[in-house]
């Protein structure tokens, strides 16, 4: 039996039991990822939006917490490793995998531009991304799609969706969530 692990890394103010990471993890479980680790870190920096210094400090603090949380996992004992991440969690996940040389795949929910700063060349064929056109954390949807395309990462753009990939229409959100999870499942298989 092949051992498969999924690691979930949330964003600030978004925990692993919210829709994208919860259902992403459940989809992975249905495909054979029976073990999972939710990374639950605490934002000790406060409001970081629009402040590059605070954003960097938050990343460093959250990354340090992630190192501590994941330190006892022997990643070499798994046949397949999947990182499901959201927002700043996408930066932490890609950086962690890169620094620890973990052969894995990534599902990037609402990545930020910094997600691609140090690792985009290494994600081709090993990642998928989802972004919304009304995401206030992204200056330009085109910038995200461009970075993904240059890195060979399929990117799915959800019209009118915010940083949680939600719109003002609850029924549209449910349809979008189903579509996002189906695309996630296709990538994981």
Predicted stretch roles:
Residues 49-50, 161-176:
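Catalytic histidine-centered segment of alpha/beta-hydrolase-like enzymes
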Residues 83-94:
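Gly/Ala-rich beta-loop-alpha elbow adjacent to hydrolase catalytic centers
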Residues 133-139, 163:
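Acidic catalytic loop of the alpha/beta-hydrolase fold
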Residues 2-77:
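Serine-hydrolase catalytic machinery in alpha/beta-hydrolase-like enzymes
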Residues 80-83, 106:
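Conserved alpha/beta-hydrolase fold motif
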Residues 101-113:
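A conserved short beta-strand
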Residues 33-38, 148-167:
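Catalytic histidine neighborhood in serine/cysteine hydrolases
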Residues 123-124, 129-131, 135:
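Short beta-strand/loop motif that positions the catalytic acidic residue
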């Amino acid at each position: 039996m092949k051992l498969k692990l999924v690691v979930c890394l949330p964003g600030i103010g978004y925990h692993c039991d919210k829709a994208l990471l919860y259902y992403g993890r459940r989809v992975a479980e249905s495909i054979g990822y029976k073990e999972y680790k939710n990374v639950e870190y605490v934002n000790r920096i406060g409001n970081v939006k629009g402040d590059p210094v605070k954003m960097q400090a938050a990343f460093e603090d959250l990354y340090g917490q992630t190192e501590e949380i994941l330190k006892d996992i022997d990643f070499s004992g798994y046949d397949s490793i999947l990182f499901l991440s959201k927002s700043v969690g996408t930066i932490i996940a890609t950086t962690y995998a890169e620094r620890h040389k973990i052969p894995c795949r990534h599902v990037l929910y609402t990545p930020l531009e910094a997600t691609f700063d140090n690792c985009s060349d290494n994600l081709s064929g090993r990642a998928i991304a989802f972004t919304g056109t009304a995401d206030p954390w992204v200056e330009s949807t085109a910038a995200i799609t461009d970075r993904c395309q240059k890195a060979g990462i399929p990117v799915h753009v959800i019209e009118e969706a915010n940083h949680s990939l939600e719109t003002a229409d609850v029924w549209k959100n449910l349809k979008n969530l189903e579509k996002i999870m189906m695309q996630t499942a296709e990538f994981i298989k």
